[in-house]
A protein has these predicted regions:
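Active-site residues of response regulator receiver
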Residues: 1
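Class I S-adenosyl-L-methionine
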Residues: 8-9, 50-226
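Conserved Class I SAM-dependent methyltransferase catalytic core
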Residues: 5, 12-69, 82, 86-87
Length: 226
């Protein structure tokens, strides 16, 4: 959870990190199929995406249970969401040589497998480019229902100890979506350590980095007590 650095707070830690240098370190540490998940709000979200369009894959939205921004409610709509930007060297698609890591949560296995064929629009390629490879002989099998969407609804944790603290349940969801038990998760701006608690709860190893001494000690204590 990087500092957004949008000049909207007076916290000394809320200064935008130099993204070019950050990506050098991420690329050095990241495994070939590793995932980078970063939270953001505009205009910071756009800066994140533009900082590495080669590895940008998609964006999700964290929808909160209640809005924020009441102090400026006379001037703009209340805010109900934050962005989650996903980067990877892996790519999306069944024919990818390096498929992106993705372990969708909450799937329900179907008792009866559903088999589909592309409709006439897909078969003709109209509107999808002339090189569309789908054809009438291709069959697509659906084994599961309840596939996740890009809208993630999670309530904020009560008694938060950091101004931008993310819900442990949301972080657990992301960790389980992109990693397996025993693997390593790093949070280089860990704040109060919620990602560390989420890793402990889900059986992952954790590396946490925090520049602020107070929050580092707070995170250490929270993780040890979890």
């Amino acid at each position: 959870d990087l500092p957004y650095g949008c000049g909207k707070t007076k916290h000394k830690w809320d200064r935008e990190i130099e993204l070019t240098e950050l990506w050098k370190e991420y690329k050095r540490l990241l495994k070939p199929d590793g995932i980078v998940c970063l939270f953001g709000n505009e205009p910071f979200t756009s800066k994140l995406i533009q900082s590495n369009t080669y590895m940008f894959r998609y964006k999700m939205v964290w929808e909160k249970e209640s809005p924020t921004g009441f102090l400026n409610s006379n001037y703009k709509p209340l805010s109900l969401f934050e962005d989650i930007v996903v980067f990877s060297k892996g790519t999306v698609g069944s024919k990818s040589k390096l498929p992106i890591r993705y372990y969708p949560q909450g799937l329900i296995q179907k008792e009866q497998v559903k088999r589909n064929r592309p409709n006439s629009t897909w078969r003709s390629g109209k509107g999808y480019g002339g090189n569309n490879k789908l054809n009438s002989d291709t069959e697509y099998v659906t084994h599961y229902a309840n596939y996740p969407t890009d809208i993630l609804k999670f309530s904020r944790d009560r008694n938060a100890v950091h101004p931008t603290q993310k819900p442990v349940a949301l972080l657990e969801y992301l960790i389980k979506t992109y990693t397996k038990e025993g693997e390593v998760v790093m949070d280089n701006c860990m704040g109060s350590g919620s990602a560390g608690i989420a890793c402990k709860n889900t059986g992952r190893q954790f590396i946490g980095i925090e520049a602020d001494d107070y929050y580092f000690q707070t995170a250490k204590e929270r993780i040890e007590k979890a």
